[in-house]
Amino acid sequence: MAASEQPQAGELLAKARRAFLEEFGAEPELAVSAPGRVNLIGEHTDYNRGLVLPMALELVTVLVGSPRVDGLVSLLTTSEDADEPRRLQFPLPTSQRPLEPGTPHWANYVKGVIQHYPAAPLPGFSAVVVSSVPLGGGLSSSASLEVATYTFLQQLCPDSGTIAARAQVCQRAEHSFAGVPCGIMDQLIALLGQRGHALLIDCRSLETSLVPLSDPKLAVLITNSNVRHSLGSSEYPLRRRQCEEVARALGKESLREVQLEELEAGRDLMSTEAFRRARHVVGEIQRTAQAAAALRRGDYRAFGRLMVESHHSLRDDYEVSCPELDQLVEAALSAPGVYGSRMTGGGFGGCTVTLLEASAAPRVMQHIQEQYHGTATFYLSQAADGAKVLHF
């Protein structure tokens, strides 16, 4: 069985150019791309100021466009999964008339970045968005679009901010325009990804370090359950609130400052459910540090064991898995050549990530599909680069 054939950035760029020419009657002047990501380990730790270990994917969002002089922004997306309408036009924000979220939802990510963009004056522009990052699959299509938008705006009106500041603008856009209180991991990896490396991110200090991930004998398999989720639903904000309440009860700024022994000792200060939520986060931060060390020394078995522990904790303590994800993980773990597998992303659907021997990939995909009650989509991806300006 083969992984889903994904268009390369060059093909997406050609598609975006054609769509732009058709829509606006001229060739676009500018083009940028930003990747989706998969988080290898460190789930629901980023908004708890913890550690995460994502890698950028070869799945990307491409944005092409040209400035215009009438102060309007005109957008088109070619994504069939995006909500209608697929095209819209609106004026640039002013201090008296800021942009506000609305419908279509896909455009809110673009609007949010425009609203919070720090440099001025920003001209109006026409743009087309083309993406190979699946929507709602837990591979961060939202941050991919935000970072592509930011990178595009930089070409129109250069900024002077740090990479961390750019990531924070994109994060703020998601908070205020999509209503998702996300951490900063997705935006940072979309900006900082480097081919052949995962990126260990400390979400407290925003320090990052590259972790080599280029062994040709190793493969990263992403399996989409094709069960869609919306993180704006009640569960994601509820988990975040529970974590903050536990940190407060223990007199800490965040769960990053909490050791497992302290959590156990303070068990009576919180509900059983809140304790389990915090136990996942505290344990996951430890697992992520251990996993990065295992990857650096090439100990894939140890890394795989930590992935499985992570999944069990997400399933049992954090309760963000679902039957489909559990089924995909169990199927992967019963196949020869697999080091480890876990759900990845926010949960309640979306994807699993599996570390395996590259030579075993076709057999493993076949095995998972045979065991899975639904229809899975597979992506094999190398660790890829972050956002970039493209040249025609």
UniProtKB/Swiss-Prot annotation:
The modification Phosphoserine is found at S230. The record marks R37 as: Transition state stabilizer. GO terms for cellular component: cytosol. Pfam families: GalKase_gal_bdg, GHMP_kinases_C, GHMP_kinases_N. Alpha-D-galactose binds at R37, E43, H44, D46, D186, Y236. The keyword Nucleotide-binding applies. One of its GO terms (biological process) is galactose metabolic process. Transmembrane segments: none annotated. The active site is at D186 (proton acceptor). It is an enzyme of class 2 (transferase). Pathway: Carbohydrate metabolism; galactose metabolism. ATP binds at G136, G138, S140, S141. It catalyses: alpha-D-galactose + ATP = alpha-D-galactose 1-phosphate + ADP + H(+). Keywords: ATP-binding, Carbohydrate metabolism, Galactose metabolism, Kinase, Nucleotide-binding, Phosphoprotein, Transferase. Catalyzes the transfer of a phosphate from ATP to alpha-D-galactose and participates in the first committed step in the catabolism of galactose. Homodimer. PANTHER family: GALACTOKINASE-RELATED, MEVALONATE KINASE/GALACTOKINASE. This is Galactokinase.
